[in-house]
Structure formats: C-alpha cells, structure tokens
C-alpha cells in the first residue's frame, strides 16, 4: 500500500509470492492451454491490480505455445471495475487468483473460479460460506488439470453453471439483507 510503512511481514509475504510466481502461473497456463485447445474459444488475460498488467503478459501469455497464444487476448492496460463487470457479464466463466474479480463475475451471473494464494487474507473463506466451494481452490493444493476439469464442467453445461451462480448470489443477497436488518435494529435500539 502507498504511504504505509513496510513491516517485516510485508517482506515475508513478498518472498513467498516471488518464490511461487512461476509455479502458480504454470497451473493457470495449463488450464488455459486445455481450454483453448479443447474448445477453440478465446481466453482473456487481464489484471485486477495495476502491478499485474505486465505480470499477466510475462507469466501467463508469453510462455504459452503459439497455437494457444494466438487465441489469448492480453489486456495491456488496467481497467476499472465497471469495465471489468461489462466483460465478465459476457464471459463464459472467470478464473482468477484475485478475490474480487470472481465476485464481480458472480454478481453478473457469470460462473467464477477463485484460486486462492496462501498469502491472501482469510476473506477467501467467504467463497465457501456463500456456497461457492465447488469453484474455490487453494493454489498450493490444486493442479492445472483440476482447474481445467472444473472449467470444463462449466463449459459443458453453461445453463447449470449459470443457475449455480444465481443460487450463490441469492445466498449472498439473503445474508446481506439479514446483516443490514441487524444493523438497522441495532441503530434503532441505541
């Protein structure tokens, strides 16, 4: 974060992230290769954070085989959430190593797979809490083949996957309403 002094934990987190960059992205590349070759569809590599724009190119796109790379669109600039939401709403699925893109996709009715990294905060637990456990993976406990298998299931039966995304959002909306009701009651009582 800008304007926040670094603490030793920041260096530990950065060291862990740096040591896992290739290994983690190799799993996503394996999934992308399988998706493109088996479906003939295009894939998009885009960043949720500004520092990830170049990272996506170097770690996801550049190492891909030429026959796959030709079907991968790399977003070379950072985008704002409303633009991401527009693209995600038209996507067959979203697969992300960041927490927020799957949420934006689900909100738009698009199936979304979240691949959590060990240095992410505990907020990733919310995916299991609101019913998206089938689409939640710990990067250290999964393979590119497992990611492709789950994505292939979405691709094979998009109606079922979209229904699951809507069900997840119903759960989210019910829980948000319940939370807001409790806050209102608490505010009225004070």
Language model features by range: what are they?
Residues 1-190:
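Active-site anion-handling motifs in enzyme catalytic cores
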